[in-house]
Amino acid sequence: GLVGLALVEQLEQTPEFEAITVVVRKESQLLNTYKKVTQLVIEDFLLLNDEDVNGHTHAFSCLGTTLKMAGSKQAFYAVDYEINAHLADLVQDKHIHLLLVSALGANANSPIFYNKVKGQLEDYIESLELEKLSIFRPSLLIGKRSDVRFIEDLGQSLFKLIENKFQKPFKYKPVTVEQLAHTMVVAALTQIEAFKRYDNLSIQQTR
């Protein structure tokens, strides 16, 4: 996805990270252009196992979809909850820092299915008490997509109009995928706390 690619680009340029393993369903020619990247091809991400994650210091999850792309609530849940929860299970009891992209409205009690699933996932992963966990809650993400997500595209246009009047960061202001990726890299390198949640404002203000 867009966030994942932006993250790979920044990790490639960060000397503290010597190697990057990217889990993909099929090999990407674009990823082959990065010197640090090794692609781990797994058609079903639920088959990711201990051997695959051992030896890593950080696990970044930018995995997510939309109800429209998934086609059903069940398919959406399988991607956004089950795969991310599986990754969290794998890194538990290992010296691995998990960094997870969630959503601004994540709330297990939300009447909105998307936000509810995001909240349930956050609650589950927090309950694992991982050695180190970062959760990022961005608002709408700005970036070019190969697929058209009309609501998000409309949101980007509306927020860009609002920004002309309100230049200071505010809670719902959209962020670029590059800024989110930058915040994740900064968190990976500097976070001291065992658990920290980065809200949309924190993401905007990270330098």
Residue spans for each PLM region:
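Glycine/Thr-rich phosphate-binding loops of Rossmann-like dinucleotide-binding domains
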Residues: L30, M69, A108-N109
